[in-house]
Curated annotation (Swiss-Prot):
Protein known as: Large ribosomal subunit protein uL2c
Family per record: Belongs to the universal ribosomal protein uL2 family.
Compartments where located: Plastid, Chloroplast
UniProt keyword list: Chloroplast, Plastid, Ribonucleoprotein, Ribosomal protein
Pfam families the UniProt entry points to: Ribosomal_L2, Ribosomal_L2_C
GO biological process: mitochondrial translation
HAMAP family according to UniProt: Ribosomal_uL2_B
Subunit: Part of the 50S ribosomal subunit.
Organism: Emiliania huxleyi (Coccolithophore)
SUPFAM superfamilies given in the database record: Nucleic acid-binding proteins, Translation proteins SH3-like domain
Main location (coarse class): plastid
Region feature (Disordered): 223-254
Amino acid sequence: MAIRLYRAYSPGTRSRSSVYYTDITQQKPEKSLVFGKKACSGRNNRGIITLKGRGGAHKRKHRIIDFKRKSIATTARVATIEYDPNRNARIALLHYENGLKRYILAPRSLKVGMEVCSGPEAPIEIGNSLPLAAIPLGSTVHNIELTLGKGGQIARSAGTYAQIIAKEGDFVTLKLPSNEVRLVYKECYATLGQVGNIDAINTCLGKAGRSRWLGKRPKVRGVVKNPIDHPHGGGEGRSPIGRAKPVTPWGQPALGIKTRKKTKASGRYILRGRTK
């Protein structure tokens, strides 16, 4: 899919670029698979900000996405490819033979009218969901389970995928989008192929207003805050941070220093750390 460039009719379109929406075949979502939800704007149940820089997004309806793909031995037909305002990937509406309707992440090259299925005996085709043990070496997969039965958690963003590089015992070795090499239990499910809308990462919003439409608020540097709000704050005029190394608002090392706990239980499954 190509990138759409805009002429400089205004300062907001001078650097703007977006993807084409020609792959979308349906404008309105399936009513039985959407629900309304009030935006929390980064607040918890007590109204306290727990995630900064969120709020003010356009009102949107949430689509119920099937990340588990547990309709085994039932074939589904791709009815539509739709836009989802809650993610940068496209979603596909499946019509199963038994009458069920489900949304899934639309893989690259998935077209309306194609058939997909899930289960250990499913064929090796784009969009099918199988256990990692049943997928050949070198295959690209997405929507990968970390815990059996919990649903896909890895490689769900637009254009992402993981690659199966080894199988040994009860585990399969995956190379993740972050270049991390990790062991995953062989019975965990994954979907074949790469997530669609691969050019989403190459787009440019062009103006601050488009960030506000997405719910992204301005980010304030710590050095211009007060000492009570950030460790870098305070001082007279344009002062330095006053520390040997930069830290987060909570005093943890920032900018390149690893903060993952070395004794974390899941650390034994990571063969090589991420580089991105």
